[in-house]
Amino acid sequence: MTSSDGSDLTTLVNVGRSVARYFERIGITEIAQLRDRDPVELYERMSAAFGQRLDPCLLDTVMSAVDQAEGLPARPWWHYTPERKRLLAGEGHDRAGGTAGEGTA
């Protein structure tokens, strides 16, 4: 899956071969396929594909990958942990307008 055109998922910060395999399992093989996608929906599809609820930290990485695919700056996966916890607690968020709480401490 090596590519010189920037489509290789492993060129994204936080996405190594292991995480790329989770994406591949649900048919995501290129960065462009992450644009305008709901990270929670992707994570839930990954969990369903593997027949178990996957580590919630994977959702942090999926959120990071989607943001990068949409042109936002690369951030470490743990930057997304507070938002992920809100999402999984049902507090919601706004992907179209950026991450909830963006720019707050």
From Swiss-Prot:
Q: Which Pfam families match?
A: Cdd1 (PF11731)
InterPro entries recorded: Cdd1
The UniProt keywords, alphabetically, are:
Antibiotic resistance
One GO-annotated biological process of the protein: response to antibiotic
Gene3D superfamilies xref list? 5' to 3' exonuclease, C-terminal subdomain
Q: Does the keyword Transmembrane apply?
A: no
This molecule's function is given as: Involved in mitomycin resistance. May operate with McrA or may be a type of transcriptional activator protein.
Listed name of the protein: Mitomycin resistance protein McrB
